[in-house]
Amino acid sequence: YVDHAKEVGAPLPKEPIIFLKPTSSLSGPNDEVMLPKGIILKKGKAPSRLVDSKRSDWEVELGIVIGDKARSVPESKAMQYVAGYTIVNDVSERAYQLDAAAGQWTRGKGCDTFCPVGPWLVTKDEISRPQNLSIWLELNGKKMQNGNTNTMVFNIKELISYVSHYMTLYPGDIIATGTPPGVGMGMKPPRYLKKGDEMKLGIDGLGMQIQKVISWKK
């Protein structure tokens, strides 16, 4: 979103930034979100060691659910491939994602439980203006994110077309479309998730999610 890029001091991208969240990150809309534990590989004689998450963050996003096989789709036909819409919480560990030496977006966003989806798949005929939906997130009862899908940098048609030119999309695939301002990383000082936090998030016409944050466990 335009205003999200501004809050984190990032320039507006000229093209969409693509990353993948694995199926192991998928969870239900009201399932617990588990803080991850990463690993620092050994260097020389120093042993590898586990590292607790310290910068896990929230991102409420509109999810586009694909309804038909889509490959190299022009923008003019992109909406034909939409089955409907859902809510996605694109939970992200910023240290794993953005570390100057070894940051990787998939590593930071692909941890177990980091992709709550739902509660519903609302078909596209029920959402007449997907590019004008209120979108919000609360943390422990305090409103953190409060935006609208009309401030997305790239619209739904552009995203479907762009992604489908690099990878074939199949029915059930979900494209998460970015987040409005109010993420923890953008606050001064930053505020990240910790054990016991509760996230509540929603989008007009798509329902609401609630997640408790728990510490890492096997």
Region locations from a protein language model:
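Extended, compositionally biased flexible segments
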Residues: 1-52, 58
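Glycine-rich, charged/polar anion/phosphate-binding loops
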Residues: 32-39, 48-51, 68-73, 100-104, ...
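Short coil/turn connectors at secondary-structure junctions
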Residues: 13-16, 22, 52-54, 58-61, ...
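Short, structured patches in soluble enzyme cores that scaffold and shape functional sites
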Residues: 21, 37, 58-68, 86-91, ...
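Catalytic-pocket segment enriched in acidic/His residues
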Residues: 4, 12, 94-218
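N-terminal accessory regions of nucleic-acid-interacting proteins
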Residues: 71-85
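Structural motif
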Residues: 16-18, 24-25, 32, 61-63, ...
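Short loop segments at secondary-structure junctions
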Residues: 23-24, 67-71, 91-92, 124-126, ...
